[in-house]
């Protein structure tokens, strides 16, 4: 406030100063509002860590107003079942995405196309049955991937191509029966692989993956137990402990399949045979060609007892041969020592024993002198 005796000029200058301060304050407020990212409704946002927590809210869709600078987005424990391909568009700064404990059954091919800086992806406990081979192609920095507790029956070839930074991978509790070694070849820096609680069929289809597991363990990778479900002889046994003799029949099976491929192929078969046409009255029914698929012969591996028996017999034979070699060496040493002792005693007796021819000549000389 101005003093009562102030001049009109002073009052004008003071009003102008207040007007300038007001304009500056308004501009600062507007800039602060524009710079402050909006937080989705009912979600919790941390401006320091750039984390948006929308977990446990019963969401059926991804909030559309997630700030573009978000680095961590938590969407676990919701009711997400189907996501559009643009659900995470313009979130190129996102590093961690958690979609665990939802009802997702499929993921669009390009849903993670903008997540070029993603390092951790959690998809645990969903209903995912299939994955597109290009799903993770645009996330080369991914380090941790959790696909456990889903309905995956197979992994498409090329799914992990380009994921050189991947350190841990969880495939536990799915419906995987076998895996292709080529699918895991690009994971040169993988350190932890979890594949337990799957219905593994330890047959020829898993032979190459067994070789890869041995190489993975040799270079220091950590791998949980891969327990066989089939065949019955191997049920509950760790795949890594199965002798390689169990897979000797695989080469024979491949030879049989290759030789069978040289035959002239017949008509394509169908799983369900079509219904036979009704014959006309008075006409004899014509035999219809069979279109049912022949049942594929299932080759079962050799018995575990037979393989173990072979190993035991080989060990016994090697042991017997070693014992015989030790006995022969001992006998040779004893014989050599006895012969050496005999020769020493013989040398000692030679000076004491006279020459019989010399004694006979001496007797002749004595008789001649006499």
Swiss-Prot record:
Query: Gene3D superfamilies, from UniProt?
Result: Ribonuclease Inhibitor
Give start-end of the signal peptide: 1-35
Q: Where are the LRR repeats?
A: 69-90, 93-114, 117-139, 141-162, 165-186
The answer on whether this UniProt entry bears the keyword Disulfide bond reads: no
What residue intervals traverse the membrane? 311-331
Q: Which residues lie on this side of the membrane: Extracellular?
A: 36-310
- Glycosylation (residues): 90, 117, 125, 257
Where does it live in the cell?
A: Membrane
**Membrane topology reported for the UniProt record:** Single-pass type I membrane protein
> What positions does the domain LRRCT occupy?
198-252
Q: What is its main location?
A: membrane
Residue span of region Disordered: 261-300, 351-370
Membrane side Cytoplasmic: which residues?
Answer: 332-370
Q: Where is the LRRNT domain?
A: 36-68
The identity of this protein, by name, is Leucine-rich repeat and transmembrane domain-containing protein 2
């Amino acid at each position: 406030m101005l003093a009562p005796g102030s001049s009109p000029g002073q009052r004008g200058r003071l009003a102008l100063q207040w007007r300038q301060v007001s304009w500056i304050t308004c501009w600062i407020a507007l800039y602060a509002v524009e710079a402050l990212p909006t937080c989705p409704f009912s979600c919790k946002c941390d401006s320091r860590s750039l984390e948006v927590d929308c977990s446990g809210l019963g969401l059926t869709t991804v909030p559309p107003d997630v700030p573009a600078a978000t680095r961590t987005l938590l969407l676990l424990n919701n009711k997400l079942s189907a996501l559009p391909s643009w659900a995470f568009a313009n979130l190129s700064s996102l590093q961690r995405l958690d979609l665990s404990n939802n009802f997702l059954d499929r993921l669009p091919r390009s849903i993670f196309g903008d997540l070029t800086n993603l390092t951790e992806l959690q998809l645990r406990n969903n209903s995912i049955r299939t994955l597109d081979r290009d799903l993770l192609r645009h996330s080369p920095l991914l380090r941790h991937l959790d696909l456990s507790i889903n309905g995956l029956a197979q992994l498409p070839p090329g799914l992990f191509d380009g994921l050189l930074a991947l350190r841990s991978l969880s495939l536990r509790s799915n419906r995987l029966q076998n895996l292709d070694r080529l699918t895991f070849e690009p994971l040169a820096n993988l350190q932890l692989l979890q594949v337990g609680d799957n219905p593994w069929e330890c047959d020829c289809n898993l032979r190459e993956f067994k070789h890869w597991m041995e190489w993975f363990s040799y270079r220091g990778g950590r791998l949980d137990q891969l327990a066989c479900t089939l065949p019955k002889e191997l049920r509950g046994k760790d795949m890594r402990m199965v002798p390689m003799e169990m897979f000797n029949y695989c080469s024979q099976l491949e030879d049989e399949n290759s030789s069978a491929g040289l035959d002239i192929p017949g008509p394509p078969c169908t799983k369900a045979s079509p219904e036979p046409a009704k014959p006309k009255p008075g006409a004899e029914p014509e035999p219809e060609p069979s279109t049912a698929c022949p049942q594929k012969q299932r080759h079962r591996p050799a018995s575990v007892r037979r393989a173990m028996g072979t190993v035991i017999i080989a060990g016994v034979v090697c042991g017997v041969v070693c014992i015989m070699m030790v006995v022969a060496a001992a006998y040779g040493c004893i014989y050599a020592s006895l012969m050496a002792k005999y020769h020493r005693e013989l040398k000692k007796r030679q000076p004491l024993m006279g020459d019989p021819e010399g004694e006979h000549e001496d007797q002749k000389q004595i008789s001649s002198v006499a």
